[in-house]
UniProtKB/Swiss-Prot annotation:
InterPro entries, alphabetized: Cullin, Cullin_CS, Cullin_homology, Cullin_homology_sf, Cullin_N, Cullin_neddylation_domain, Cullin_repeat-like_dom_sf, WH-like_DNA-bd_sf
Family under the similarity heading: Belongs to the cullin family.
Tissue expression summary: Kidney collecting tubules.
Keyword line: Isopeptide bond, Nucleus, Phosphoprotein, Receptor, Ubl conjugation, Ubl conjugation pathway
Protein's UniProt name: Cullin-5
Gene symbol of the encoding locus: CUL5
Gene3D superfamilies: Cullin Repeats (1.20.1310.10), Cullin, Chain C, Domain 2 (3.30.230.130), Winged helix-like DNA-binding domain superfamily/Winged helix DNA-binding domain (1.10.10.10)
Amino acid sequence: MATSNLLKNKGSLQFEDKWDFMRPIVLKLLRQESVTKQQWFDLFSDVHAVCLWDDKGPAKIHQALKEDILEFIKQAQARVLSHQDDTALLKAYIVEWRKFFTQCDILPKPFCQLEITLMGKQGSNKKSNVEDSIVRKLMLDTWNESIFSNIKNRLQDSAMKLVHAERLGEAFDSQLVIGVRESYVNLCSNPEDKLQIYRDNFEKAYLDSTERFYRTQAPSYLQQNGVQNYMKYADAKLKEEEKRALRYLETRRECNSVEALMECCVNALVTSFKETILAECQGMIKRNETEKLHLMFSLMDKVPNGIEPMLKDLEEHIISAGLADMVAAAETITTDSEKYVEQLLTLFNRFSKLVKEAFQDDPRFLTARDKAYKAVVNDATIFKLELPLKQKGVGLKTQPESKCPELLANYCDMLLRKTPLSKKLTSEEIEAKLKEVLLVLKYVQNKDVFMRYHKAHLTRRLILDISADSEIEENMVEWLREVGMPADYVNKLARMFQDIKVSEDLNQAFKEMHKNNKLALPADSVNIKILNAGAWSRSSEKVFVSLPTELEDLIPEVEEFYKKNHSGRKLHWHHLMSNGIITFKNEVGQYDLEVTTFQLAVLFAWNQRPREKISFENLKLATELPDAELRRTLWSLVAFPKLKRQVLLYEPQVNSPKDFTEGTLFSVNQEFSLIKNAKVQKRGKINLIGRLQLTTERMREEENEGIVQLRILRTRKLYIQIMKMRKKISNAQLQTELVEILKNMFLPQKKMIKEQIEWLIEHKYIRRDESDINTFIYMA
């Protein structure tokens, strides 16, 4: 019965029956007139009914809609074209377009069933999307064909004129330009590229007009106002154009209009004047004009390869200014390691501040700073260190190196040793200054030289017990580890501290054992240091000296005590590294003298004959010291800089220890005394060890030669390791890998690299490739 009624009503559900009810509502919607809820729902219902019951209904609805939409648009077209003036036409168009475009989102909604029917089953599974609506497409296509395609050039030109006027400071309604853009964006019928019409027309016109504007404006502004004012102008215009582009150009994700516009502006405002702007860079750096440099940096960073010339200028400035300052202060800093380090740190802080303020610590400029500062630190023109190298009995010299690592080690020693400098600083201040040294050390190429000198100073501090702060001493070892010093070196330093602690326990045990025994010297007055040869690595050279009887008799006692606790180990006595305190008595007073073993041996020659004059020749026989060591020791007793009255007198007078002859006579100064504030002190203590090295002249030469030999061995060893792993490698790649591994210790010289390659070939570790002499092959 229900089916029969539906079939009876089917006749009343035809298009012809319903359109007369539907059309008034459609026209109201097109004209943006109010529609009641009932009318709105009726339209949905009627469209649904016609699409279901009238086979030709959907096509008829589509055609009828098209006709009504076209008619509505023709009326709008007439209103727009009634204006002859381009600006008036643009305003009229935008008014009509805004109303129509709003309805493009509303009118399609009641026609959902039409969409489903016309698109078939496939479409029925898709989510309803107004933007993809057939009705919406019909509305936009009709608008495009009837109005927009005919006047789009006039609209576009008007819009560009408005933008041009805005650039010149004139005000207008920005919605006029935005409306034209929206028309271009929304009226494209190409489903594959909905922005094609917009890109080909509006975007292109916008970019072209922008470029034309600045190609005209920029050169004249530069000519009239100069580079520095022009940079401000260019920066302001780039920011202004970016804001304008965000208003007037399409900003959706798939569109890169703003980026294209900014590239266009950069080309017109910056790239075209790149050389002219960059020509000012060097002068700005010299004058420390950080604000102007920052502005130049922000502009040049937008230009391909714009930063490279600035980096080059910065590097050149740091090197030239840095070396100029070092040369200007050379007289002071070459003799004062504290002043030298302070000068380097002042330079580093100055250049770092420049990079921070001008370039915002940009990594590229930090790298340039590091590269240039490294060149200053490692420059050898002012401070040369020549390392000797003996080959087949012939003394050679390597290429001069910077003395920086040696001076850094000396400064560390001043901070870590009991000195006037360390005494006036707190522990925190000493720590801060050591951290500053480590900062500079990062830039030192030949860190192995620093290591050698630092270890020599540490040896001296530990043996003489003159460290200012033992905790900071041990912390320094860990800091060196943290900054990437080789582990084998740092481990040896740590072992040195262990030896000192073990020696303290041994001393305590020795004193306990002999507290009731009578020794040549009281046990309490003896301090023994047993050092591991591997960690302390002293020279193999033994310097013989004839010891006073008291010391000579003590040695067997110590050896016997040590063997009881450590069987199988042999002690080698290094008198060169020993020191002690002796009491000097004369008619003036009594004084304690801190002396080396060599000084002690010389002074004890007068114990039985205090008022006699002894010749250089007889002192050599009495002490059995080598000639060079005796001369050095005697000079420290006759010309000690801190004493107004020397311990020994001599005749005839000479200018240096080298001028002593076999007949030079020495005697004890019976009027020796310590003078303080112009007053003679009857008692006191003086350290005569001073800066006497705990090494002989020959041992110092060996130390320096050892640096070179160790470099050769490390280079050779690494070459073999690399070749073993690579099997076959080019000369360039081999050298690159070698330098990369060794850079934390030293920078191998080209001559050394070449010599070691030849050595490896000669000893059949590697061979040259027959087809390419610059390629090496590993030989097992």
